Amino acid sequence: HKRVAYHDFEGLALATEERERLYEDLAGHKAMILRHHGLLTVGADCAEAFSLMYALELSCRVQMDVLASGQPYSLPPDDLCEHTAQQLNDFPVPPREREWPGLLAMLQRVNPGFDQ
C-alpha cells in the first residue's frame, strides 16, 4: 500500500538520461510500475527482488481480473490497507527467506545443474 513508484513510458530505454529519471521516480521504493511497459523491482539481493516481483505481478493480475469482470468492486479502507502493509513489513521472516530456498529447490528439480 503506497509502496509502489510509477514511471511514465518514454519509448525504448536507449537514452542514458532516462536512468536518472527512473532513479528519481523510484524514490526509495523497491517496486515500480513502468506505465504502458512493465514492472521493475529492486532488492538487497536477487531473492528479495524476485519475491517483490512475484507479489507485484500477482497483484497486477488480480486487479486485471477484477476489472475485466465488469462487476462492481470496493477497496478496503485506507487505514486497513496501511495496517496490512505494515503487518507484512514487520513479519518476522521476510518473503525472500520463506520462498527463495523452496524456489531454488524446485528449479534444481526441473533443471538440475542450473546453478553451475
Language model segments and positions:
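Glycine-rich flexible loops
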Residues: 1-116
